[in-house]
Each structure stands twice: as structure tokens, then as C-alpha cells.
């Protein structure tokens, strides 16, 4: 009787483990993936006649790539703006996202401070640019969910990491 009970318990434990494994596999097999982005949106009117603004924009790109590498531990060989997570569930992805948010905010602040330094150093040249010559950057951090069927992903969470603005101030005569 004891042997039958132990055998039944073992079969139950193995079948429960098998069912649990199958449930995990099915959630992994649906193709849902999560990715983190630290990036910026830009609104600008920058031309070859505004080299300082072009330099600032190029510096913003460079610093953002460096920030992505620092945040995710990637390399310049990979696309640093798309950091796929190992998380298979939205809950796990959000937990990883929350760990990186504070780091991303401080990276955004560092980038904005560096760009403001460039803005101050070049204030005289920028003042000579027409008013419509401008550069506005919005730094942000996003958690994106996507499946093979999606053309673009669904934003699950996002955090604003700061803004940078610079514009010429010269009145243009018409």
C-alpha cells in the first residue's frame, strides 16, 4: 500500500512538473518579446549654415549611443537602441525596466548637461543664427512589447528623461 502511494505521488509530481513546463513553453512560444529603448525624438531646422547646431545634434547621437552601451552593457557593433530582454512575461519585463529607469534618467541628465555646456560655449555663434534655426531633443526611455505579427511594437511603459532646446535669435528681414 505504501509503495502504491509513493508511486502515485511520484507520478503526480512528474505530471505536475510536465504541465508546469508545458505552460512555460507555451508562453515562450507565442513569439512575444520585450525590448528597451533609450533614445531621443528631435524637432529641428538644422542646415549646413548652422554648423554649431549640427555639431550639437551629432554629439547628442554619440552620447546617446554611449548611454545605451552603459545602460545595457552592449557594444557599438550591435544596434544599441534596441535592447531585447530575456524576460518572457510583461511582469518580468516591467521589473527589468524599473531597475533601469533611474539609471536612464541620470544618463539623460548627463547628456543634457553636456549639450548645455556646448550651447553655452557657442552662445555667440548661435545668437547669429536666424530664429527659425532650432534643435529640440526629447530624451526618453521605453519598454516595447512586440510579436512576429506586429509591424511595430506596443509601448508598455515610457519615462521622460529630459529635454534640450537651442535656437537662433537673429531677426530675419524679409
PLM region descriptions:
Residues 8-16:
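Bacterial N-terminal signal peptides
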Residues 23-105, 110-116, 144:
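Acidic/polar, low-complexity intrinsically disordered N-terminal segments immediately downstream
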Residues 104-174:
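Extracytoplasmic electrostatic interaction patches
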Residues 18-20:
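C-terminal motif of bacterial Sec signal peptides marking the signal peptidase cleavage site
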Residues 1-4:
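Positively charged n-region of N-terminal signal peptides that target proteins for export
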Residues 6-7, 98:
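General helical structural elements
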Amino acid at each position: 500500500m505504501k509503495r502504491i502511494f509513493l508511486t502515485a505521488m511520484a507520478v503526480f509530481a512528474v505530471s505536475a512538473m510536465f504541465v508546469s513546463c508545458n505552460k512555460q513553453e507555451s508562453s515562450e512560444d507565442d513569439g512575444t518579446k520585450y525590448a528597451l529603448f533609450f533614445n531621443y525624438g528631435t524637432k529641428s531646422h538644422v542646415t549646413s549654415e548652422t554648423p554649431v547646431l549640427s555639431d550639437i545634434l551629432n554629439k547628442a547621437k554619440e552620447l546617446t549611443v554611449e548611454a545605451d552601451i552603459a545602460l545595457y552593457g552592449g557594444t557599438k557593433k550591435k544596434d544599441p537602441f534596441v535592447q531585447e530582454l530575456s524576460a518572457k512575461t510583461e511582469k518580468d519585463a516591467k521589473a527589468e525596466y524599473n531597475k533601469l529607469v533611474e539609471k536612464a534618467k541620470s544618463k539623460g541628465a548627463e547628456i543634457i548637461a553636456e549639450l548645455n555646456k556646448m550651447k553655452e560655449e557657442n552662445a555667440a555663434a548661435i545668437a547669429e543664427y536666424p530664429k527659425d534655426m532650432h534643435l529640440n531633443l526629447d530624451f526618453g526611455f521605453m519598454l516595447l512589447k512586440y510579436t512576429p505579427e506586429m509591424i511595430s511594437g506596443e509601448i508598455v511603459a515610457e519615462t521622460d528623461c529630459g529635454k534640450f532646446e537651442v535656437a537662433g535669435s537673429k531677426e530675419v528681414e524679409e
